[in-house]
């Protein structure tokens, strides 16, 4: 039997890059929360964060009528993650916070506020008004491999990372500190079905007074065993806990973090392609974010409808243009109906213009900080509108399923 291994990784909320993602999305949420309802569609946010030893730098472009206390938001986010003592190497109370935030470029605003379609045809359709915030390609994916419609390796890696944070915050394992990483290797058979977990790797920041043996035993009992399904653990499954032997110095004390450096962790763990655009700190007129959510929404509903076992969707946009430049649907040979029919039905049922995506998925809510750690897709601990399965019935009827 041919053996195929696939590996995905995740990181905890205390990882330096994820600290930055959470800060950027916390600022976006504050804008969406404080902006008057009638003006939310005009609010803009593109915020980048850097964290390093004792320092946070927040920069970017924003358009809002609301007052946003950025330093306080930064400090509270860091404290909530768990960096609240100097001995952890980083402290939200005492770190320096530098901000350099400007207004959105008027050249960009020209095309986003009033799309190419409106300028050229004077269309009255409100969904034509907003153009894409940039050019680019975006991918969405779903598979019936798991009940979350996600590939198993990234799903398990996220759940291990979340579990690491949960047992730390509940003081179940009070020697843990905020930084951490997980990685899961899954074995697949010749039909691409998962048959076992080949390797579990966990690197967890810890206090200096815990022995390696105690740490390993505690991680196995309280993190790995509750997450990895028993039927996927074999006699050959390898468990690696802190293979360097020590992980006391972590977080921004050990590594500089930046917004948008964990884009594969954020999506499908490398199983599906990525267009390259990060999510955090971007308002939903940025199609890097909203169109990726839309592509996932469509792919998930298609798989749930029984149209295919897996679906990969690619979208592309031009800056300032409302309509997508291209839509590609790939079922990897698993379609139960004609792919041309699937494409036609998708274009009839779903609207891929940015304003329509924002409206239909209700993307002007302050929900983004929750996306900034443990993945944007396939979550059970939170509900996101792009994870809804509210088009399954309509798709089944249209596709004759």
Swiss-Prot record:
Binding, ATP: 15, 179-181, 246-247, 255, 261-262, 278, 282
Annotated spans, Flexible loop: 104-114
Record GO cellular component, one term: cytoplasm
Cytoplasm as UniProt keyword: yes
Cofactor(s) this protein cannot do without: Mg(2+); K(+)
Catalytic activity: L-methionine + ATP + H2O = S-adenosyl-L-methionine + phosphate + diphosphate
Domain of life: Bacteria
Keyword Cytoplasm included in the entry's annotation: yes
GO molecular function list: ATP binding; magnesium ion binding; methionine adenosyltransferase activity
Positions that bind K(+): 48
EC assignment: 2.5.1.6
Record keywords, A-Z: ATP-binding, Cytoplasm, Magnesium, Metal-binding, Nucleotide-binding, One-carbon metabolism, Potassium, Transferase
Annotated positions binding L-methionine: 61, 104, 255, 286
SUPFAM superfamilies: S-adenosylmethionine synthetase
EC class: transferase
InterPro entries xrefs: ADOMET_SYNTHASE_CS (IPR022631), S-AdoMet_synt_C (IPR022630), S-AdoMet_synt_central (IPR022629), S-AdoMet_synt_N (IPR022628), S-AdoMet_synthetase (IPR002133), S-AdoMet_synthetase_sfam (IPR022636)
Residues given in the record as Mg(2+) binding sites: 17
Location within or outside the cell: Cytoplasm
Cofactor binding note from Swiss-Prot or TrEMBL: Binds 2 divalent ions per subunit. Binds 1 potassium ion per subunit.
NCBIfam families attached to this UniProt entry: metK (TIGR01034)
Family: Belongs to the AdoMet synthase family.
Primary role: Catalyzes the formation of S-adenosylmethionine (AdoMet) from methionine and ATP. The overall synthetic reaction is composed of two sequential steps, AdoMet formation and the subsequent tripolyphosphate hydrolysis which occurs prior to release of AdoMet from the enzyme.
Subunit structure: Homotetramer; dimer of dimers.
UniProt name for this protein: S-adenosylmethionine synthase
Organism, as annotated: Petrotoga mobilis (strain DSM 10674 / SJ95)
UniProt gene name: metK
């Amino acid at each position: 039997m041919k053996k195929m291994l696939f590996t995905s990784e995740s990181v905890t909320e205390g990882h330096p890059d994820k600290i930055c993602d959470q800060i950027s999305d916390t600022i976006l949420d504050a804008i969406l929360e404080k902006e008057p309802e009638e003006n939310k569609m005009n609010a803009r946010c593109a915020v980048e964060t850097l964290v390093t030893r004792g320092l946070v730098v927040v920069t970017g472009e924003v358009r809002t009528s609301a007052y946003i206390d950025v330093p306080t938001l930064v400090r509270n986010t860091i404290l909530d993650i768990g960096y609240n003592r100097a001995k952890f190497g980083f402290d939200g109370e005492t770190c320096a916070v530098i901000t350099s935030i400007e207004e959105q470029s008027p050249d960009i605003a020209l095309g986003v506020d009033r799309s190419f379609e409106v300028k050229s045809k004077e269309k009255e359709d409100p969904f034509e008004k907003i153009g894409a915030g940039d050019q680019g390609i975006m991918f969405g994916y779903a598979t019936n491999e798991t009940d979350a419609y996600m590939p198993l390796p990234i799903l398990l890696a996220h759940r291990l990372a979340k579990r690491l944070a949960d047992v730390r915050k509940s003081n179940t394992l009070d020697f843990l500190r905020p930084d951490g990483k997980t990685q899961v290797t899954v074995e697949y058979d010749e039909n691409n079905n998962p048959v076992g977990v080949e390797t579990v790797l966990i690197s967890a920041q810890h206090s200096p007074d815990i022995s390696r043996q105690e740490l390993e035993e505690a991680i196995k009992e309280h993190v790995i065993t509750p997450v990895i399904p028993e039927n996927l653990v074999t006699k050959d499954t390898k468990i690696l806990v802190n293979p360097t032997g020590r992980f006391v110095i972590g977080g921004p004390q050990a590594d500089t973090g930046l917004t948008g450096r964990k884009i594969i962790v954020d999506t499908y763990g490398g199983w599906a392609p990525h267009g390259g655009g990060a999510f955090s700190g971007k308002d939903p007129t940025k199609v890097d974010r909203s169109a990726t959510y839309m592509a996932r929404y469509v792919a998930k509903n298609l798989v749930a409808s029984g149209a295919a076992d897996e679906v990969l969707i690619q979208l592309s946009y031009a800056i300032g243009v409302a309509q997508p430049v291209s839509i590609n649907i790939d079922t990897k040979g698993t379609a139960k109906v004609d792919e041309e029919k699937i494409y036609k039905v998708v274009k009839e049922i779903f609207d891929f213009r940015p304003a329509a995506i924002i409206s239909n998925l209700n993307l002007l809510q302050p929900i983004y900080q929750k996306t900034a750690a443990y993945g944007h897709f396939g979550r059970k601990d939170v509900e996101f509108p792009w994870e809804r399965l509210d088009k399954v019935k309509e798709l089944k009827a249209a596709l004759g399923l």
